[in-house]
C-alpha cells in the first residue's frame, strides 16, 4: 500500500510567467519532499484584471492583495510572488519565508521586431528623437528621460507576450522589460540591450527586489517554512532586504521612481547604489554605500541609513511631489509627463 502524499497548496497569479515561476519552484522543491503533492491555485489580481489604468493609479498591493486573502483564510499554504511586486510592509500576519536565488535583475530593451530584423536600431542611443518607448514604470521612464530626453515614453500594459506583440504591431519602437521574465520564458533572443548603472547601460538602476522570487507564508507557520527553506538563497535575501529597507524608509511603493543596484564585493561586502529621479528626469539624488553585511538586520540598517541620507539631500522632496500627483489623480500617466 503506497504512502498517502501530503498536499501543500500554493497561491500564484495566473499569468503565463507566474505559472512558469511556480513550476520552477515546485521542480526545485520536489526532490526535497518526494512525498508531498504541490497543488497550484492561480487567480487574477487587481493588476491582472485592470489592463487599462496606469499602474501608479492602482496603488500598492495590486498584485498581492487577493492572494494574501487566500493565505490568511488558509486556502493556500504559501504564495509565490515576484519580490518586486510586494509592498515593503506586509499585512499583519504575513511574512516572507524565503527568497530564491536571483535571476538577472537588470532591465532590458526589446526592439520592434522589424527594427531588430533590419539591424536598424540596437540600443536606445541609436533611436531618433521622438522615438516611442513603451513602459508602464515611472522608475524606468524617469531614469531614461534623464539620459535620453529626446525619446517619448508611452504606457504599455499586459503580460510579456501582449507587450511584445504591441511593440511589434503598434507605434512603439521598443519596450523596456525586466530581463528575468524574458529569461524564464525563453525569450532571450528578443533582448537588444542590457540596461544597468554604467554609461553603456543607459544609467539605469533596477527595481527593488527585481529578479528574485519570494515565498510569503503566515507568520508562525513553521511547518510551511521548513518545507520551503531549501530554496532560500541567503545572499539574495540579504541584498534584497537592504533594497526593501531603502524603499520602506522613503515610503515608496512599487510605482515610484526609485532605482537600486546591489552587488556583492568579495565574500561579505555589499555595495548598494540608489537613485531617486524626478518624473521629468531633470532632478535626481544618487547615493551609494559599501559595508560588511552578514545578517538581514545589518542589511536593513544599511538601506535605511542610505535612504535617510538621500532624503536629506532632496529625495524626499521628489517623492512627495510624486505622491501629491498620485493623490490628485492622473498625474502619473507615463505619456503625460
UniProtKB/Swiss-Prot annotation:
Give the sites modified to S-(dipyrrolylmethanemethyl)cysteine. 254
Give me the disulphide-bonded residues: none
Q: Which reaction does it catalyse?
A: 4 porphobilinogen + H2O = hydroxymethylbilane + 4 NH4(+)
Q: Kindly tell me the pathway this chain contributes to.
A: Porphyrin-containing compound metabolism; protoporphyrin-IX biosynthesis; coproporphyrinogen-III from 5-aminolevulinate: step 2/4
Q: Which GO terms describe its biological process?
A: heme biosynthetic process; protoporphyrinogen IX biosynthetic process
Gene3D superfamilies recorded: Periplasmic binding protein-like II, Porphobilinogen deaminase, C-terminal domain
Pfam family membership, one: Porphobil_deam
Protein keywords: Heme biosynthesis, Porphyrin biosynthesis, Transferase
Q: Which cofactor does it need?
A: dipyrromethane
Which additional comment does the entry carry? The porphobilinogen subunits are added to the dipyrromethan group.
The role this protein plays is: Tetrapolymerization of the monopyrrole PBG into the hydroxymethylbilane pre-uroporphyrinogen in several discrete steps.
Member of which family?
A: Belongs to the HMBS family.
**This protein is called what?**
Porphobilinogen deaminase
**What is the protein's species of origin?**
Neurospora crassa (strain ATCC 24698 / 74-OR23-1A / CBS 708.71 / DSM 1257 / FGSC 987)
**Which lineage ranks, top first, belong to the organism behind this chain?**
Eukaryota, Fungi, Dikarya, Ascomycota, Pezizomycotina
Gene behind the chain: pda-1
Amino acid at each position: 500500500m503506497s504512502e498517502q502524499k501530503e498536499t501543500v497548496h500554493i497561491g500564484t497569479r495566473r499569468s503565463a510567467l507566474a505559472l512558469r515561476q511556480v513550476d520552477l519552484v515546485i521542480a526545485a522543491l520536489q526532490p526535497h519532499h518526494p512525498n508531498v503533492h504541490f497543488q497550484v491555485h492561480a487567480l487574477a489580481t487587481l493588476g491582472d484584471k485592470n489592463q487599462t489604468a496606469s499602474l501608479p493609479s492602482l496603488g500598492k498591493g495590486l498584485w498581492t492583495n487577493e492572494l494574501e486573502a487566500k493565505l490568511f483564510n488558509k486556502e493556500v499554504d504559501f504564495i509565490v510572488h515576484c519580490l518586486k511586486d510586494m509592498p515593503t510592509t506586509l499585512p499583519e500576519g504575513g511574512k516572507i519565508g524565503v527568497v530564491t536565488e536571483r535571476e538577472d535583475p537588470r532591465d532590458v530593451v526589446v526592439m520592434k521586431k522589424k527594427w531588430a530584423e533590419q539591424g536598424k536600431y540596437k540600443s536606445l542611443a541609436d533611436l531618433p528623437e521622438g522615438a516611442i518607448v513603451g513602459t508602464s514604470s515611472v522608475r524606468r521612464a524617469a531614469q531614461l528621460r534623464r539620459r535620453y530626453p529626446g525619446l517619448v515614453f508611452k504606457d504599455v500594459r499586459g503580460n510579456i507576450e501582449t507587450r511584445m506583440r504591441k511593440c511589434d504591431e503598434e507605434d512603439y519602437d521598443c519596450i523596456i522589460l525586466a530581463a528575468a521574465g524574458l529569461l524564464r520564458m525563453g525569450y532571450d533572443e528578443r533582448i537588444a540591450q542590457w540596461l544597468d548603472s554604467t554609461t553603456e547601460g543607459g544609467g539605469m538602476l533596477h527595481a527593488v527586489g527585481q529578479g528574485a522570487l519570494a515565498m510569503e507564508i503566515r507568520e508562525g507557520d513553521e511547518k510551511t517554512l521548513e518545507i520551503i527553506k531549501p530554496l532560500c538563497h541567503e545572499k539574495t535575501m540579504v541584498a534584497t532586504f537592504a533594497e526593501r529597507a531603502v524603499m520602506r524608509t522613503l515610503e515608496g511603493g512599487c510605482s515610484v521612481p526609485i532605482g537600486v543596484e546591489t552587488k556583492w564585493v568579495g565574500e561579505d561586502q555589499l555595495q548598494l547604489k540608489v537613485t531617486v529621479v524626478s518624473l521629468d528626469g531633470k532632478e535626481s539624488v544618487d547615493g551609494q554605500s559599501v559595508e560588511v553585511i552578514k545578517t538581514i538586520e545589518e542589511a536593513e540598517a544599511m538601506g535605511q541609513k542610505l535612504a535617510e541620507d538621500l532624503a536629506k539631500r532632496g529625495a524626499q522632496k521628489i517623492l512627495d511631489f510624486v505622491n501629491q500627483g498620485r493623490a490628485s489623480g492622473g498625474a502619473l500617466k507615463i505619456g503625460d509627463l
